[in-house]
From Swiss-Prot:
Membrane-topology descriptor: Multi-pass membrane protein
Compartments it resides in: Cell inner membrane
Main location: membrane
Pfam family for this entry, one: MFS_3
Family that this chain belongs to: Belongs to the major facilitator superfamily. EntS (TC 2.A.1.38) family.
Keywords: Cell inner membrane, Cell membrane, Membrane, Transmembrane, Transmembrane helix, Transport
Purpose of the protein: Component of an export pathway for enterobactin.
InterPro entries in the record: Enterobactin_exp_EntS (IPR023722), MFS_dom (IPR020846), MFS_trans_sf (IPR036259), TM_effector (IPR010290)
Transmembrane segments: 22-42, 56-76, 84-104, 110-130, 157-177, 179-199, 219-239, 257-277, 288-307, 314-336, 357-377, 379-399
Periplasmic side: 43-55, 105-109, 178, 240-256, 308-313, 378
Species in which this protein is naturally found: Escherichia coli (strain SMS-3-5 / SECEC)
Gene Ontology MF terms in the entry: enterobactin transmembrane transporter activity
Protein name in UniProt: Enterobactin exporter EntS
Length: 416
């Protein structure tokens, strides 16, 4: 057959046992992190009644993740990657235990939540970078595109399930249960990861880490195509930071604790559908234009989200944002792999991930600040429509990205 299917091809999970182990570990990890992602903002909102404080926690964690990604890129290129992955996961679990113990105190410490957020953000990003660096060795460079879509599906499905579980746990047992189960899940992920083969770094000349990073930055700034992709990715993650307003919007919509979980699950659900139906994305003749348009649509969805009179309609807007952002993100990933020289792939992937984290942190800080000056509804709408205006300007300015054309790859039987 030579007709390309809309559905994602999952054959890598059958043919590559090491990738299957990573798939399982990542799914458990995402569920665990989702429990954490619901608990932290709700706990801070309950303690402080301040959206600014909620945004600050996300910003601090994002800053720690950025540093961790930079350090992790250097470690992954110099040390055995399996050891880096295992060390990072185990250390994260210790931080989650700390959050659980803090939540059990008669008066939990807000400072402890912030400090443990820094701890977990830093060490979690070390593992992410090492896994990204190891993926070509696990699946083969020719399968990276398929592996990326499967990874997104894993992340999104886990992110759909965990917020709903987290919301139910909040309604029945409190945040300590969320933290405790997150710690347990993180340590469980070590079991499949222990089965990975040794993942030594590639041989390369010794270079000062800062010099290597600067070379990556220079390439990013000098390439209007790759640089434009990275810029869109940063803006897209800024829009996703709207989650810092969920607790306040939930009060506005008079949602129960269990219903709050649907807000956190909506974006991952839409993105999971986007990843599952991504079979034809790699065959788009004009991926740059499609990326720009899907990004604009996602900004519009966020702008409309806060204006919805009922929470269920807000969930629909968030799901639409998730679907459109998944389309844009998959196109970003694919074009970065194909348009970046092989010698730069590791650094550019690391910088792309880091700027996504930075965009999330900046977005959280801005939304937290807006939430202190405006109503939650006005804050959400202002962020979405503001990004939409910026996106329209980029549609006009990023000429090379908008006009980029590619020859659709040849389809094989396994693609159909």
């Amino acid at each position: 057959m030579n007709k390309q299917s809309w559905l994602l091809n999952l054959s890598l999970l059958k043919t590559h046992p090491a990738f299957r182990a990573v798939f399982l570990a990542r799914f458990i990890s995402i569920v665990s992190l989702g429990l954490l992602g619901v608990a932290v903002p709700v706990q801070i909102q309950m303690m402080t009644h301040s959206t600014w404080q909620v945004g600050l926690s996300v910003t601090l964690t994002g800053g720690a993740m950025f540093v961790g990604l930079m350090v992790g890129g250097v470690l992954a290129d110099r040390y055995e990657r399996k050891k880096v992955i295992l060390l990072a996961r185990g250390t994260c679990g210790i931080g989650f235990i700390g959050l659980c113990l803090n939540a059990l105190l008669p008066e939990p410490s807000l400072l402890a939540i912030y400090l443990l957020g820094l701890w977990d953000g830093f060490f979690a990003s070390l593992g992410v970078t090492a896994l990204l660096a190891a993926t070509p060795a696990l699946v083969g460079r020719e399968n990276l595109m398929q592996a990326g879509a499967i990874t997104m599906l894993t992340v999104r499905l886990g992110s759909v399930i965990s917020p709903m579980i987290g919301g139910l746990l909040l309604a029945t047992g409190g945040v300590a249960w969320n933290y405790g189960l997150a710690a347990a899940g993180t340590f469980i992920t070590l079991l499949p990861l222990l089965s990975l083969p040794a993942l030594p770094p590639p041989p390369q000349p010794r270079e000062h880490p800062l010099k290597s990073l600067l070379a990556g930055f220079r390439f990013l700034l000098a390439s209007p195509l790759v640089g434009g992709i990275a810029l869109l990715g940063g803006l897209l993650t800024m829009a996703s930071a709207v989650r810092v307003l969920y607790p306040a919007l939930a009060d506005n919509w008079q949602m129960s604790a269990a219903q709050i979980g649907f807000l956190y699950a909506a974006i991952p659900l839409g993105a999971a559908i986007g990843a599952l139906t991504s079979g034809k994305l790699a065959h788009s003749a004009r991926p740059g234009l499609l990326m720009l348009l899907s990004t604009l649509g996602s900004f519009l969805a966020i702008g409309l989200f806060g204006l919805m009179p009922m929470w269920i309609l807000g969930v629909v807007c968030l799901a639409l944002f998730g679907w459109l952002s998944a389309v844009s993100s998959l196109l970003q990933y694919t074009m970065l792999q194909t348009q970046t020289p092989e010698a730069m792939l590791g650094r550019i992937n690391g910088l792309w991930t880091a700027q996504n984290v930075t965009g999330d942190a900046i977005g959280a800080a801005l939304l937290g600040g807006l939430g202190a000056m405006m109503t939650p509804v006005a804050s959400a709408s202002a962020s979405g429509f503001g990004l939409l205006i910026i996106g329209v300007l980029l549609l006009l300015v990023l000429v090379e990205l908008r006009r980029f054309r590619q020859t659709p790859p040849q389809m094989t039987a396994s693609d159909s």
